[in-house]
């Protein structure tokens, strides 16, 4: 630090009101954001002569400036603190590494409603059920729904262009509303009504209705219908046995388990909606050294619930451990304010709630132990690689790969690893253009130029660069990167990874820029790390290539037609249900598409027939 922060003069200007403070270092970077009920009292605590916390000592030694924002209430301060943490990602704050939105089950407002997975903003007309902990839980529920309530799950464009029921109808997974002779609107609406009640958690109401239906069908000697209702009843009861917490509880709850050890904290959330367990998820926030459990937990609570602040995602009850409830009153008030209803925290649960809290704590401990073991494995692999490459330290590695099919839709990928493993938010794909199809050297050169030609922050310069390829690829990569590393404070080690003759894992040949080749034993931890980063790069490239190839093949036939831009292409595909259906359409059918004249329809028809 170039100067010592004058805390005495600063504290004279601070008020006793609630608010938020931002601490900056000498480079004017925000290093900590905090909130307080009494700003003067809280900020004074940092500058006492005797401070026990090592984290606080380290923080104070780096302070060059403090900004203060006064708020009307502590709740306002809490929300503002959360927004600042999201904006600045300060070094000394606990950071929740979770930018994923939670998935829902969506029931559309269509004449014949469709049920599907939904993630993101709720813009479409219809009903949303959830949230679910992950897409796997949603797909499992949708699979179950298909068996009990065969409401359609096909896209509207597919539905609109059916002339006879699809395979899903044949195997009993769809009622077939696309064909009017299969099921009436009234019967389909009744089926959707059962599904709606089921997703709302009103299983017993559905059971009562189905039992009545079964008895009526039996009395009328419609035994096939009665058997169908019986199967639905049995399936719902099996689901109830698997999911219900208690028969008398129909409330929404989150049960939060907690574990912390060796600089790693885990919060395990068990999600219960309408009395049913939807699933669970473990979270591992990024925590500064010497951060106590209370601060970790409070920071997590705020960031987790305010990041997903739609009213439906905040349950009416949150169950947590007694020893972590010291300072949650302000958080409870803030969540109630955001949700628009009272949110209650329970710290001494009994009965089924107590059992689920114990289970959640056990899951948190198990997940944390697994994480620690994984970290130890990664550390061992990094140490082995340092020994193999004779390097003092490896903080960052990058790996490049190229993917294409016979030169079509070429994509390059770059993946990043640090000492904790993959850094997926820094993965990148490069759309390769302007080269001869199949020229991997040119593709690699273009990707590396786009990656390294721009100015890099020091911490973004890799210690090791892996190239998935042989000597030619590595030499080309070295030529490109050598143009840019003149101003770098360090020069990365470059290694080529050539597959063995049989392309079998464990037989890879490693190549240096000097042309030396070497192999590692198949059980060597260093080789396992190299295989890991190579496979990540390979999979990332293939995923991008397949997506690009699929998009190209779907639209390329229309892209060359004069007068057909993106909007008309979209209208054509949406109206007809896809490219193959469009190719089979007549001129008159194409002319029915909104925005397509008869003369343009003839041009499109002739172009697609070539």
From Swiss-Prot:
Pfam families for the chain: GIY-YIG, HHH_5, UVR, UvrC_RNaseH, UvrC_RNaseH_dom
GO BP annotations listed: nucleotide-excision repair; SOS response
InterPro entries the record matches: GIY-YIG_endonuc, GIY-YIG_endonuc_sf, GIY-YIG_UvrC_Cho, Hlx-hairpin-Hlx_DNA-bd_motif, RuvA_2-like, UVR_dom, UVR_dom_sf, UvrABC_protein_C
Entry's Gene Ontology molecular function annotations: DNA binding; excinuclease ABC activity
Highest taxon in the source lineage: Bacteria
Residues in UVR domain copies: 204-239
GO cellular component, one term: cytoplasm
UniProt-annotated location(s): Cytoplasm
Domain GIY-YIG: 16-94
Keyword annotations from UniProtKB, A to Z: Cytoplasm, DNA damage, DNA excision, DNA repair, Excision nuclease, SOS response
Keyword Cell cycle attributed: no
The protein's role, per its UniProt record: The UvrABC repair system catalyzes the recognition and processing of DNA lesions. UvrC both incises the 5' and 3' sides of the lesion. The N-terminal half is responsible for the 3' incision and the C-terminal half is responsible for the 5' incision.
Family label: Belongs to the UvrC family.
Complexes and interactors: Interacts with UvrB in an incision complex.
Protein name: UvrABC system protein C
Protein source organism: Vibrio vulnificus (strain YJ016)
Species classification: Bacteria, Pseudomonadati, Pseudomonadota, Gammaproteobacteria, Vibrionales
Gene behind the chain: uvrC
């Amino acid at each position: 630090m170039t100067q010592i922060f004058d805390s005495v003069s600063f504290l004279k200007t601070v008020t006793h009101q609630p608010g938020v403070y931002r601490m900056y270092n000498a480079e004017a970077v925000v290093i900590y954001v905090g909130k307080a009920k009494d700003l003067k009292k809280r900020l004074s605590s940092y500058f006492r002569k005797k401070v026990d916390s090592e984290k606080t000592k380290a923080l104070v030694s780096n302070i060059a400036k403090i900004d203060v924002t006064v708020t009307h209430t502590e709740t306002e301060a809490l929300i503002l603190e959360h927004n600042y943490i999201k904006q600045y990602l300060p070094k000394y704050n606990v950071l929740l590494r979770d930018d994923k939105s939670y998935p829902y089950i969506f029931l559309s407002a269509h004449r014949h409603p469709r049920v599907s997975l939904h993630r993101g903003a709720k813009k479409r007309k219809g009903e949303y059920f959830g949230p679910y902990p992950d897409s796997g839980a949603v797909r499992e529920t949708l699979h179950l729904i298909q068996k009990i309530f065969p409401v359609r799950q096909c896209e509207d464009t597919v539905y609109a262009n059916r002339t006879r029921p699809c395979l899903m109808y044949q195997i009993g997974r769809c009622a077939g509303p696309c064909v009017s002779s299969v099921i009436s609107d009234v019967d389909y609406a009744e089926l959707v009504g059962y599904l709606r009640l089921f997703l709302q958690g009103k299983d017993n109401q559905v059971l009562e209705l189905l039992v009545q239906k079964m008895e009526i069908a039996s009395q009328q000697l419609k035994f096939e219908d009665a058997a169908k209702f019986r199967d639905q009843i049995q399936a719902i009861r099996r689901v109830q046995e698997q999911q219900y917490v208690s028969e008398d509880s129909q409330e929404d709850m989150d049960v939060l388990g907690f574990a912390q050890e060796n600089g790693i904290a885990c919060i395990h959330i068990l999600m219960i909606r309408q009395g049913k367990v939807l699933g669970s998820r473990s979270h591992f926030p990024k925590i500064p050294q010497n951060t106590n459990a209370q601060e970790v937990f409070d920071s997590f609570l705020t960031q987790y619930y305010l990041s997903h602040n739609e009213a439906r995602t905040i349950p009416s009850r949150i169950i947590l451990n007694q020893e972590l409830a010291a300072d949650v009153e302000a958080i409870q008030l803030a969540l109630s304010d955001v949700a628009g209803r009272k949110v209650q925290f329970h710290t001494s649960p009994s009965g089924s709630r107590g059992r689920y809290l114990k289970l959640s704590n056990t899951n948190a401990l198990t997940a944390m132990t697994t994480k620690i073991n994984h970290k130890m494995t990664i550390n061992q692999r990094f140490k082995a690689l340092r020994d193999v490459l004779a390097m003092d330290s490896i903080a960052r590695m990058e790996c490049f790969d190229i993917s294409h099919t016979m030169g079509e839709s070429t994509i390059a990928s770059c993946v990043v690893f640090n000492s904790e493993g993959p850094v997926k938010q820094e993965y990148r794909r490069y759309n390769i253009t302007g080269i001869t199809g199949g020229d991997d050297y040119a593709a690699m050169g273009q990707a590396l130029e786009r990656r390294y030609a721009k100015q890099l922050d020091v911490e973004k310069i890799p210690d090791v660069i892996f190239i998935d390829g042989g000597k030619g690829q590595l030499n080309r990569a070295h030529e490109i990167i050598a143009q840019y590393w003149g101003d770098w404070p360090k020069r990365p080690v470059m290694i080529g990874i050539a597959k063995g003759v049989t392309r079998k894992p464990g037989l890879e040949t490693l190549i240096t820029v000097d042309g030396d080749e070497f192999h590692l034993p198949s059980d060597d931890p260093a080789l396992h790390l190299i295989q890991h980063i190579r496979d990540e790069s390979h999979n990332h490239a293939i995923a991008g290539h397949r997506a690009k190839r699929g998009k190209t093949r779907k639209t390329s036939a229309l892209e060359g037609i004069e007068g057909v831009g993106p909007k008309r292409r979209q209208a054509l595909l949406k109206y007809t249900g896809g490219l193959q259906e469009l190719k089979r359409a007549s001129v008159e059918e194409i002319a029915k598409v909104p925005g397509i004249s008869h003369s343009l329809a003839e041009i499109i028809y002739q172009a697609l027939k070539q």
